[in-house]
Amino acid sequence: MEAPSESVHNNHFPKFVAGMVVALILVMVWSWYGREKTSLPEVLRSELTSRDGLLFQELGTQPFTGFMIESYKDGILKSRSQVVEGLLHGVSDGYHPNGQLQVREHFEKNISHGLRTKWFASGIKMSEATVVEGQLDGTFQRWDETGTLVEQIELRAGKAHGFSRAFYPSGYLKAQASMQDGEVINQQSWPDNEMKVASIPTSDTP
């Protein structure tokens, strides 16, 4: 009865070894990736200089690639921005004095491009917008410190285009304007607890 048992164990042993090898490889790859991710230098903004629109370290001969950082007087991180070949390129974060994330936006070759989000010092989201090549484009939303939506604006190429809406703390609509290329087409306002967004006709959308 013991021989079959030994055979079973022997059959499983190669699979066990293979599994261990795969796990070891994954750990090594993850460790390498982590080192690569953090290997870029972090340099104070005050130690960088601008030449012909590109950022250089004070004695550097090549445009800077790494992270540009700023700190408050007490040493708490104020901002951290990725720089590639002298240009803002990647994620740029700003922080409140309490360490809470204040703003996060994305850059492509020194131009804001992508989602831009801001937060209150409490951690509650303040606003969110999409930026396309430096201009707001799409839906901009703003909240108060309780997390209640207070404003919503549709934009196109940096101009209000579509509905711009303001809300009461109750969530009911306070005012609405129909916009086209930054110009007001028509506007309405309501007392609190009267109008919900879902009940407003939208046939006059530009």
Where does each model-flagged region fall?
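Glycine/tyrosine- and acidic-biased, solvent-exposed loop/turn segments at the edges of beta-strands
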Residues: 2-206
